[in-house]
Amino acid sequence: MATENFLIELGTEELPPKALRKLAQAFADNFTAELDKAGLAHQGVQWFAAPRRLALKVAALADKQADKQVEKRGPAVSAAFDAAGNPTPAAAGWAKSNGIEVAQADRLATDKGEWLVYRANVAGQPTTGLLPAMAATALAGLPIPKPMRWGAKRTQFIRPVHTLCMLFGAELVDGEILGLRSARIIRGHRFMGEAQFEISHADQYPALLLEKGKVQADYETRKAFIKAGAEAAAQQLGGIADIEESLLEEVTSLVEWPVILTATFEEKFLAVPAEALVHTMKGDQKYFPVYDNNGKLLPNFIFVSNIESKDPAQIIQGNERVVRPRLSDAEFFFNTDKKHSLASRLESLDTVLFQQQLGTLKDKSVRIAEMSAFIAAQIGADVEHATRAGLLSKCDLMTNMVMEFTDTQGVMGMHYARHDHEAEDVAVALNEQYMPRFAGDNLPNGLVACAVAIADKLDTLAGIFGIGQAPKGDKDPFALRRAAIGTLRIIVEKQLDLDLVDVVSKAAELYDGKISNKSVVDEVVDFMLGRFRASYQEAGIAVDVIQAVLARRPTRPADFDARVKAVSHFRTLDAAEALAAANKRVSNILAKFDGKLKDSVDAALLQDPAEQVLAQQVAAMETKLAPLFANGEYQLALTELAALREAVDTFFDKVMVMADDEALKLNRLTLLARLQALFLQAADISLLQQ
């Protein structure tokens, strides 16, 4: 079967930069699915994306579908002919629908009887006739929240589309998509190269676009060029470029012909906290800041131009001119804000609602202060400093700097607290209270910061659940999922001895009657344990391991984590499968017994050697493992319990648990209950799958 490379390119208005990769990847995935559905063989789909185009290139695409044999079953032979042997209306109608006579039908014998069947070879359709509809379907499935119309057309897309090119090798694929007919026209860079040109073969893409149109359509090549160029430029400045992945992606999506340039700003602005300057450079201007080898911000930045100028100095000066007023604003806000202490802004928080039913940000700050003190006392942090940090935690929200540059909340609180001569761990806590801000983010360092970060998150969780506004579906306006997982990460990774029931109860109590949900503590704890489960699954922990631990509902996250790790390790042991099965058997036996078990095993009633051995080993394990369980050393404990496998197997092979003698039966059930209780101190391993 002959093959050719296939190209499709849509020339558009500027596409949303933050969505460009997602759109291109979805286009490739959708089109690949269409090819597979149509049974068209190929050797891979590559996507291209630039600000004004989306394109796909399919390698070695078959020129037609493979021929295939179809088989259409008709009525049963018994129903296909009447007593005289003539075709019934059912048989005649079926044959007509398939374009044959009844006599031309084959017969298919099955264990349920004989049936009429029509077999035919169907020739595969030419690929070029299928491609337009497949491409249209792939485009229709793109993640476009708000499609737009343009001109007098009724078609919709994320941005207006001006060109469509579909080539199967050298052949122009005839078809219409989004109101445009396919043509050989490709548009180049808006200001460089040829405005538009013709492409004669799919293999010429993207090289011809690069040569004639001055557009680097390969997204990954463009991204790598920008990253390497920015790093080299920073090195020439004697520094290191701050190339955040999300910003690199956005800049890559904004330019078709990247040109790396460096610029400077006045050193006087370095008196302003670096975070505020960086926010302006990254967030507003899409610049890459530069730091020296000690992590100090330099008065330089790197930016990416979308045009190769004969006079790059003009472009550099233009960017310096644009950023200067923003840096001046930051300088003004910083100097103005320092005239008033953070503490003096506490009262103004009373003018800002946290949530209508839950009070103001001042109310929240007071609760966080009390909650921080409660947590600090339990984890060995400075209670006075934790209280102070909690009280000041939201004061920077009332500063000019944070009102203008909202992403600087927390970090500006830290700088202002230092200016006010607050204790250093108080100042640091004001910044770190929001950590972790996203998956994989750093955690608070000091214990005071941990106390405030946990207090803030638990206050939000208890309050929002307390008024019955738990997250539903994808809607989570108060970021409760992030708050829950952040709290759990801090407790587990910092190994803090906190019980969720205790801290959530305290958080709910501090609302002092403002919340109406009486089951708020249970709901928040269950919600947090649910997030725990999800995070472990994402980390690759087996579901049955998580279920085995959840069955015990441990509410100390650090303890929960230790159990999960222990059960994961236990699951790898040779004895695990047999002991899990034995525990399941024990659970079933005990579940059917509705009487009262004895407090202890009566040695005099142990008749069979197998039950005597098991009783001795269980008693020995109870003594040996008590300190291990008390110290949370579950992995060591479960490893020791694996040694019971032989005794347990022999017991079930030799001993009739449900003996006719009531005393013997009760004694054996008590022995099994003690065996089960040993394992349950870690997890319910009966839930482990084979």
UniProtKB/Swiss-Prot annotation:
SMART domains referenced in this protein's UniProt entry, alphabetically? DALR_1 (SM00836)
Superkingdom to which the source organism belongs = Bacteria
Q: What class of enzyme is it?
A: ligase
The record's annotation in InterPro entries points to: DALR_anticod-bd, Gly-tRNA-synth_bsu, Gly-tRNA-synth_heterodimer
Which SUPFAM superfamilies does the record match to this protein?
HD-domain/PDEase-like (SSF109604)
Which GO-annotated molecular functions does the record name?
A: arginine-tRNA ligase activity; ATP binding; glycine-tRNA ligase activity
Kindly list the biological process annotations in GO that this record carries.
arginyl-tRNA aminoacylation; glycyl-tRNA aminoacylation
- Which reaction does this enzyme catalyse, per its entry? tRNA(Gly) + glycine + ATP = glycyl-tRNA(Gly) + AMP + diphosphate
The EC number of this protein is 6.1.1.14
State the compartments where it is located.
Cytoplasm
- The primary location reported for this protein is cytoplasm
Task: Provide GO CC annotations from the record.
Answer: cytosol
Q: Which UniProt keywords apply?
A: Aminoacyl-tRNA synthetase, ATP-binding, Cytoplasm, Ligase, Nucleotide-binding, Protein biosynthesis
Q: How does it assemble?
A: Tetramer of two alpha and two beta subunits.
Query: Hey, which family's this protein in?
Result: Belongs to the class-II aminoacyl-tRNA synthetase family.
According to UniProt, the name of this protein is: Glycine--tRNA ligase beta subunit
